[in-house]
Amino acid sequence: MLSNSTFHEHHAKSHFHNNACQSNASSSACRASEDHLVSSFPNDSIIDLQPSRPAPEPPKKKFGYYARRLSGHFLSLIHGSGNSTRSPPFHLQNQKSNGQSEVWHSSDDSGSPKRLNRSRSSKEDMYRRRSLHGLPSLSRRNSKKSSTLSRSISLHLRSESAPISLPIHLYKSYSYNHSPSSLPTVLNSQALSSPPVPTTPDEVSTNRLSSSTSSMNCRNLVPDNFNISIRPNTTNYRSSIQENSNGNRDSISPSAYDAPLLHNVDTQSIDGFVSVASHFSSASTAESLDDGHSATTIQQGDVSSYPLSRSVSTPVPMSPISISPAKPSPQSPKLSQSAVGHPSSSIPAAAMHKVSYSDDLMRFVAREKYYLQIVDCLCTQKDPLFFYTDFTKICQQDTVGTYVARQTLDKEVVVIKRFDISAVTHRRLLLEELQRLSGLSHKNLIRYNESFWYLNNIWSVFEYKDPSTKLSALIPKYFFSELNIASICYEISSGLAFLHNSGIAHHNLTTECIYLTKSSCLKIGNYAFSSPYIERQTNRGAVSHVPDWLIEKNYKEGFMKDVKSLGLVALEIFQGQPNFFRKSIQSIQLTPNANVLVNRVRGLISQEFKEFLLQTLQAETLQGPNINMLLETSSFLEKRQTLNFEICLNNLNLRERKASRYSYL
């Protein structure tokens, strides 16, 4: 047991402890209820109220950003159970014109929300900014992509609508009423109205987007007489490939190049899914390139399209152009019966907007259209793989490939030349010669069958001749007399005369492209596509190798070059030696003159043959006769004798024929 003194001492301590606890509790309650003022402290203790350490600097950069977010989170946790309430999401707020906001306050007693009309506090502004942080914005950001999208904005008006690049510098901001029936058929500059009041979250988000778009000052960038025709969007944004009447797939018609003249911009409005399409056309283009498709019929509920054959994505990228009001269109668009009584249904004079293109663009469009018209008339727009099989590629030179194939039905062997028209530099010469080629038919020329247009390539089909029947394969084996040589030269001259009269120069006449037949007739190959539009003029027309030294850049002198080549062929047949163009050092430019060549065989040939060689070898100097004069006046060609080439062909050994089949590769 404790003594009396110890008990009294312990009792005094416990009494003091209880009084201290009560005073501390009362002071804490007072601090919770009211704040102390400096005047409540004694005057002597004011001097002692000094900070123990300097105040810390506010956080900076990213650390400050996260620190402010963390402090705001702590404040929301501390004051969340008090009277203050958290601001609701943005879609539950409705801003008023007087600066106040209607805040939805969730009461603790009842689950139903209550609406409070009061001014927004700074904490509510903070929560509002946080709710707007994840929403899409139309503001320009400091990124690489913003520089490329400076003139267009990607609009996502509805979840099911595709993003469309809208050039906002060409259009005014239009707004529509709620009912789709009240949509005007034609919107002019007076069809502006205030946006509707949003009632649903979708309309709120759409209204926010439209308000951001309308805030941009674009009204003064469009002429007042520029109008936009409205029609419901019932087709896909990308036009599909249409099947041409002459082909089955990937067919290209001349109307495909009318697409650069049309720039359609389709958007889906808030209600009605309307399609805003502005048809730009040039008056000068319609006069020079009119093919019956310049007028467009616009009907409500239907979208009239242009007959495009390629997959064309609109709007077509345009270069900087000058915009000017268009002249009145002679054929005005037709309107539906429901839009006749509408006050805005009258079509102004400048309903069609005019875009003035440069002269270079107009010439390019006209030239491409001319090319496609030729291709459409001369070529079959089908896949050649449907008609020919067993393709064997035998040579490839630049953009020209040569194939040996077999027809699917009658199994006839043909030669197919494939030209990539997009890679050919002089397409005009290629297509014009293809046009001439379709009318060529001569007994001394390799027969031309047909042409195909598929995947931007031209496939030309020719008659096939066995390489073992080439004249170069027979020269080392057999001796030809002057009468036989005269018969061969006459056959070659007849074929060249027909080519020259048709406006085609061969340029590549050698013994490698002359074929013998059993009907005692010669066939000249490699005559097609021999104009100087291909950089390297080798392996173009026949399945034989053609040297480069016979190619002449000057197209006008090509006819005389063919006459000189005829003389070299005659001299080679007589000598029975490897031809002059077997050696790279010998060419037309480096070969000796006519007198030197004739003196080598002097004493072995007749006078008529000597005169024939001098006339043909001097034709390059433009002093000799052309091929027509040579046929009429040459006495050497008159004493020709019919040669039976069947005997020569039958005497060839089968092994030699197989060895010479692909000797040119």
UniProtKB/Swiss-Prot annotation:
User: What does the organism's lineage look like at the top?
Assistant: Eukaryota, Fungi, Dikarya, Ascomycota, Taphrinomycotina
Which comment does the entry carry about domains?
Answer: The protein kinase domain is predicted to be catalytically inactive.
UniProt subcellular location: Cytoplasm
Q: Which organism is it from?
A: Schizosaccharomyces pombe (strain 972 / ATCC 24843) (Fission yeast)
A GO molecular function annotation here is: protein kinase activity
Presence of keyword Cytoplasm? yes
Q: Which PANTHER family match?
A: STERILE20-LIKE KINASE, ISOFORM B, STERILE20-LIKE KINASE, ISOFORM B-RELATED
* Protein name per Swiss-Prot or TrEMBL: Protein kinase domain-containing protein ppk2
Q: Name one Pfam family in it.
A: Pkinase
